[in-house]
């Protein structure tokens, strides 16, 4: 059937579709061209025209006409023309076979059912719920996080997991476990004297409302010594040695006015409480004495007349000041000591001054 179908289609299908004239119109031009170009080729052209399809038949006839220029050539080309005409049904057979195979495949194809694998996921969820208890999904986000696990659970070594399993509770290691909050509360309940480690008598239970004001003591006695040193000096800006001696030795006269006589001997210098309080000021006065321009050795060059006059003028001024403050017995004692002062001034030596300085420094 396939061979008959191919033969019918080769002659009748394409010429009717391409040209309305059919085979008669196509054979005549092919035969005329073959006669004009060559006799031997005419038969080949005719055969090619009959076996061709559509427009290709005229071209095959022309090709056969060209080849038919001589008898030997036409005889050689003739089998080629027949072979070309017979190749068309072979092509049709292959097309028909492929079409039939496609029809068979379509007929035998059946749709495959899609099997859902949701059951195995449900089984896993049921197992998890049975192990951890009933929990609704989506109700609490913390439940989902706990089921997923921490970020460290996926990246821990086996040794770390063993450490977690071996870790003991804080109750077992009670000696190393300290609750800081309870410790702070216990310390706050203790009294203040125990917390500060101080005697209970030194800690005041209540805070005083008014704090007593403390006024510092002002020592005006030292200022008197400084003012006395800044008094009138001798000629040339240098005071006599006995004047300096009397200033330092006459401290009891200025501070404690019970003994107004400035005696140069060591027996007359008795320590009193004002002297101890003015110890710091004495050091300052000693620095002033050492910084004076006149050295101690120049005291020998001073004339006795000048020293006696200066002593008398100074003693007169001291007597005037003491008369206003002191009683009459003190004035009589000064008059008794006046004749002794010039004699003692002459007996002042460098050794006594050095001893006096040493006593002041010590």
UniProtKB/Swiss-Prot annotation:
The modification N6-methyllysine is found at residue 230. GO terms for biological process: apoptotic process; negative regulation of apoptotic process; negative regulation of G2/M transition of mitotic cell cycle. Residues 8-17, 50-60 have a biased composition (Basic residues). It is found in: Endomembrane system. Keywords: Apoptosis, Membrane, Methylation, Phosphoprotein. Highly expressed in testis, ovary, thymus, prostate, spleen, small intestine, colon, heart, skeletal muscle, liver, kidney and pancreas. The keyword Ligase does not apply. Residues 37-47, 61-72 have a biased composition (Gly residues). This is Cell death regulator Aven. The lineage of its organism: Eukaryota, Metazoa, Chordata, Craniata, Vertebrata.
């Amino acid at each position: 059937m396939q061979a008959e179908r191919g033969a019918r289609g080769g002659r009748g299908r394409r010429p009717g579709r391409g040209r309305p004239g059919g085979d008669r119109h196509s054979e005549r031009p092919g035969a005329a061209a073959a006669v004009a170009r060559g006799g031997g080729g005419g038969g080949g052209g005719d055969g090619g025209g009959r076996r061709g399809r559509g427009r290709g038949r005229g071209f095959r006839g022309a090709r056969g006409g060209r080849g038919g220029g001589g008898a030997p050539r036409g005889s050689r080309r003739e089998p080629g023309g027949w072979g070309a005409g017979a190749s068309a049904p072979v092509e049709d057979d292959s097309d028909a076979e492929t079409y039939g195979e496609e029809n068979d495949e379509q007929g035998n194809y059946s749709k495959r059912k899609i099997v859902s694998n949701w059951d195995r996921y449900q089984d896993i969820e049921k197992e998890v719920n049975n192990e951890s208890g009933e929990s609704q999904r989506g109700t609490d986000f913390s439940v989902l996080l706990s089921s997923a696990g921490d970020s460290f659970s996926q990246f821990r070594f086996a040794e770390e997991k063993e450490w977690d399993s071996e870790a003991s509770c804080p109750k077992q290691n009670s000696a190393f476990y300290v609750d800081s909050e309870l410790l702070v509360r216990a310390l706050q309940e203790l009294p203040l004297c125990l917390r500060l480690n101080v005697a209970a008598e030194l800690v005041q239970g209540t805070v005083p409302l008014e704090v007593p004001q403390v006024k510092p003591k002002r020592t005006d006695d030292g200022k008197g010594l400084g003012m006395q040193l800044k008094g009138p000096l001798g000629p040339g800006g240098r005071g006599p040695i006995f004047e300096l001696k009397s200033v330092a030795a006459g401290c009891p006269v200025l501070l404690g006015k019970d003994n107004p006589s400035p005696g140069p001997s060591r027996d007359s210098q008795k320590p009193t409480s004002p002297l101890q309080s003015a110890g710091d000021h004495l050091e300052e006065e000693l620095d002033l004495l050492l910084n004076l321009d006149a050295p101690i050795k120049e005291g020998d060059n001073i004339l006795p007349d000048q020293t006696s006059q200066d002593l008398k003028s100074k003693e007169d001024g001291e007597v005037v000041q003491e008369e206003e403050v002191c009683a009459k017995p003190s004035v009589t004692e000064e008059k008794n000591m006046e004749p002794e002062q010039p004699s003692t001034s002459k007996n002042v030596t460098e050794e006594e001054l050095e001893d006096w300085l040493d006593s002041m420094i010590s």
